[in-house]
């Protein structure tokens, strides 16, 4: 067993996470490698001086740009947006490890009245029209719904039906996020 002082442990962690020393991660491959090493990075839509995922990568990856992350997510599909308690960005290769979450979402979705019918209408609409967001999906009204795997929906009230059905289908893995415009998911 190796014993480390607190100072050595701090230095190791800072080096491991690419926060001190020469850049270990470079360009698009470096951004992907960092997410693989970290396991996931949290997506946070708040953008005061940059979104959390972008700031996380910018501080560790030489040459990182917002376009780099967009390409990894929505063109190359090496990363995917998926809930890991909160919406996170994770390597696509880790998708199988989240089947337990998807199964929980499928099972939990059965309790929400009208959801199955809305999912079927949504599937048909998507086949005919391609990616949509909750404003462009023609599903009206409110419903009782909340995610079984992350903080989305209302536990004690109603939420928009279009948003609910799309979030449910993302949670079950039936849909993945095609792209985002700002924080809007398509």
Give a label for each model feature:
Residues 1-186:
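Long, low-complexity intrinsically disordered regions
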